[in-house]
């Protein structure tokens, strides 16, 4: 007779002890040290069957409170995430066998905890490792018992949310994919009388819109019918999910809703006014999604007269908006740590860049007001001035509303003006002077949120005001806006300070040299703000100072200005420790100042250089031994310090020699070039390139190491994270090549091979990397044409196409020296790409270097001579503007 498998049983004393610990852990009144309890629980985790105890307590300890059972379940969930793969098969099997019968537990808290644990296990081993799971879920869903249906739906919804693809894969032993089994049941639950089932079913199906499995694609009609049935569901959470479904379908598969577009738009317009703000917020997302999906704008156009009033109405602050709570906060209240937004330093990048870099205030809560303003902004960009007839009368009406109780309507009208400033500028431009004249007094409004929004809206009109500054009235208005924003920098209200400072930074970017006559006044206001702001707004002042330096460059390098600017910054610099995160924005600020002042930064350079070195060394120590360093490792310190050193190199030029000569920067930099963090490597290669330009001799002792490590970045996996690293490494190799010449020979073949691949797949990488690859390839070809020419046929066409996009400058001249050099070595290798060579040459507006001009002419005339009668055939394939530009070479 076969032996019966022994089922695991807990020991009573162990069970009692664990339950006691869990009770103390969750008790609000427990006087016991919670950290000690946690340590004991962690100690128990080392026993192989500890997780069996936890599942037993969750599922079977009916004499214990639901809270204790739930705590056991949550601890089990966390343990399984790390420990499940290394558990014995018996223990894995026991836990799974205990969970499934509990899907229909009477208490919903127990059911949902079980559902969470099931999804964790499925995340680890898929559904093929748990044969009993899918039949158990189907049985519960088909049971007609609410507890069982709800428990199974909860578990299924978590699987759909966390790992949707797992149900859309082939499972051994199953005739069809799990999604084909579950989707009809989920769609059926749309009609359930139980709100919880309707919500879970709809939420589960929505998870599949992005990946759109065949099962859902083939059931789209049923899905859409179900959405229309649920559209007016009494439960707000269900209506919210209906809106989310329409938004996602619009984004992912707009053709699916086109036949129903009018009904969907009518519905979205209706629920945009839903009494539940979360529903109206989800509905509001639809209008931007519609425009982004490039659905026919004329369908939306007829809705504008009804839609725009709703959006404007929703742009007013809600009574419970958190901004209202802190709107009265005055400058004397110190910032708490939680008031500080997370900050993200962007590592230095060489070349034009086409990644998004929106500072979109993502830290703040997204709400109906912001979403409605974003929708108006998008509509203004799609329809331009066509929205003005519906919008402007409402804005004027709101702006003229008097009385304190109408301040929210006035504020929303100012926000709307700012939102349409770019999209509707043609229609607004004739009235620009009146609009600005109306906004200026609002900078002194008694309501701080009106003062702050007026700052933002004026900054949105800034670039157009600057265009008008050529005429006396326009210049006078520009000055008034400038002075108005500077005055608000010194507001006593923190929100207004923040808005004014951000708005001023925007105006600085647009105005550039127009700021020069006002530099003294600007610096006095900025440094006065610097002296009075709390920590959070201080970061924005640093940004405004840095932006000012970027905008006016060497104009800042005057003793009178430096006397205002530098002493407070230096004092703050000395006050902060090397591990204080408030150093980050100051390091960034000094980077901009050092680049702007150039050699004018020399008096401040030595202590700044040494501080950067100290910070990098401290962090490299903290990485391996935090206790010895007395600081926790944070790579942002290294990135900011490397970028400031790059700024010094760029600003001081060869003057950096005296700083780096006796330092160990070379070894520190080499370490950073091999760091596992992409942003550290990105900044390290930027500094390597800057040093190569101004003081290449310093890199000489480790030259081959630098070149080898840089070349490795070009053959790495070029995902989004590594693209910018590869870009800077590529640029640095090119800078080194023109300085050390023949010494780059050992890496030429490897780099040329990598650059050829990058150029061939240019559509998969960003513009900066393509341009830098074309330039560096040209520089290597110039120095070692003999090594590059044999491989011309691999990259000639994409290389020439990339060079056509590079703007005229010294780097382009270098690249063309290389192009001409390889063609001279291997003229026949360029014949098949001759049309592209001609287009690249024609991309020059003017070649300033006489020797490059001569070499280009020799290449063209060489091919003309070599091809004889075929030359005319080659020219006939060129566009007329290209032929016209080539005519200057007498070909």
Swiss-Prot record:
Q: Which domain of life is it from?
A: Eukaryota
- Which coarse location class describes where this protein primarily resides? cytoplasm
Domain Importin N-terminal: start-end pairs: 37-105
Please give one Gene Ontology molecular function term for this protein.
Answer: small GTPase binding
Q: What GO biological process term is on the record, naming one?
A: import into nucleus
Which residues does the annotated region (Disordered) include?
A: 326-352
- What residue spans do the HEAT repeats cover? 14-42, 47-85, 94-127, 133-170, 180-210, 223-250, 262-289, 305-382, 390-421, 433-460, 478-511, 519-552, 560-598, 606-654, 665-696, 704-741, 749-785, 793-826, 835-867
Report the PROSITE patterns cross-referenced here. IMPORTIN_B_NT
**Which is a Gene Ontology cellular component entry for this protein?**
nucleoplasm
InterPro entries linked to this entry: ARM-like, ARM-type_fold, Importin-beta_N, Importin_beta
Keywords, sorted A to Z: Acetylation, Cytoplasm, Nucleus, Protein transport, Repeat, Transport
Q: Where is the composition biased (Basic and acidic residues)?
A: 333-342
Subcellular location(s): the record lists:
Cytoplasm; Nucleus, Nucleoplasm
Where in the sequence is N-acetylalanine found? 2
Functionally, this protein is described as follows: Functions in nuclear protein import as nuclear transport receptor. Serves as receptor for nuclear localization signals (NLS) in cargo substrates. Is thought to mediate docking of the importin/substrate complex to the nuclear pore complex (NPC) through binding to nucleoporin and the complex is subsequently translocated through the pore by an energy requiring, Ran-dependent mechanism. At the nucleoplasmic side of the NPC, Ran binds to the importin, the importin/substrate complex dissociates and importin is re-exported from the nucleus to the cytoplasm where GTP hydrolysis releases Ran.
Similarity remark = Belongs to the importin beta family. Importin beta-2 subfamily.
Subunit annotation: Interacts with RBG7, RBG8, RAN1 and RNP1.
Q: What is this protein called?
A: Transportin-1
Q: Which organism is it from?
A: Arabidopsis thaliana
Q: What is the lineage of its organism?
A: Eukaryota, Viridiplantae, Streptophyta, Embryophyta, Tracheophyta
- Gene, per the UniProt record: TRN1
